[in-house]
Amino acid sequence: AEKDFAENKRLFVRTGSQQRIVDSALAWSTGFWGNSWVNKTDFEVQIEEPGFNTTLAPNFACSAAADSFKIQEWIESYLGKATARLQQYVHGAEITPMIVYGMQQLCSYDTVAFGRSDFCSLFTEEEWLGFEFTWDKRFFFDYGPGNQVGPAMGLGWLNEFVSRLTRTPWNSTTQTSENATFNAHADLFPVDRAIYADFTHDSVLTSVLAALRLPEFSIAPKLDDKHRAFRTSQVVPFGARMVFEVFDCPTPVPPPSALEHRRIPLKAYPPEQYLRMKLNDAIVPLSGLSQCEDRKDGLCTLSGFLDSHADRNNQGWWDRCRG
């Protein structure tokens, strides 16, 4: 950060216009720099409303964006017993499975706010597993790979990310949900910074995962699969963070397997740039991408990552957004 400030004078922070997102961006900036952040940060707010493009809320640019998971039938199935159990304590009003589902959500917010909630004990472990699975299905089929426009809604941000990685101006000929008014100007969409911070929604992070085409996150969740990778509580919990780090390595970094078996001498590897992806502080191996090696450290060469996504605008994803 200090190096970035010394070389570029300003950090670059973007946020959508919903107040909670703006507040998060302001809090992060203050925590990063202290109260002097206003003197060290370019702070950009992009409008989240119909008629405005922004990769931080791409649903406004995608007319075909719609929920595809039929939630009510599943909720009635897993909360049927809970509804009957709670109804006996409520007189003069009917308790429905959707109301009970809302009660489970109250527990979630209460727990995040205060650390623990006695309210949660109203439900059994099986009912909480059903609640977790509800959100896994919702995010996978509403915003992720399970929705026909899931990758499309993450494509615009991926296009911007490639521009940042390669330090090249945004390409208007492949525009999807990007805001051309911002991205056409270097001061509003800089590509020369060492650190960028974008603040958006958990749904958008899910769409970006879909656009990245990481195999482990492309498998539809199943209730009886205890090892499923797409688990919303781990992928996009409250305060979810997706971080990409670029390493400039002046000395070679061979795959760990090559070092272990001493098959290839170090001098065979030229200096290289590597990319690492972290999701909520956990390293996400990039070996599932077509041009990335299978490495125990999860790294991929920057060129390999870029080559893996060179065809991203040729998949017809954005055409689905147009119906």
Where in the sequence are the language-model features?
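Signature for phosphate-centric chemistry
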Residues: 1-12, 16-196, 200-323
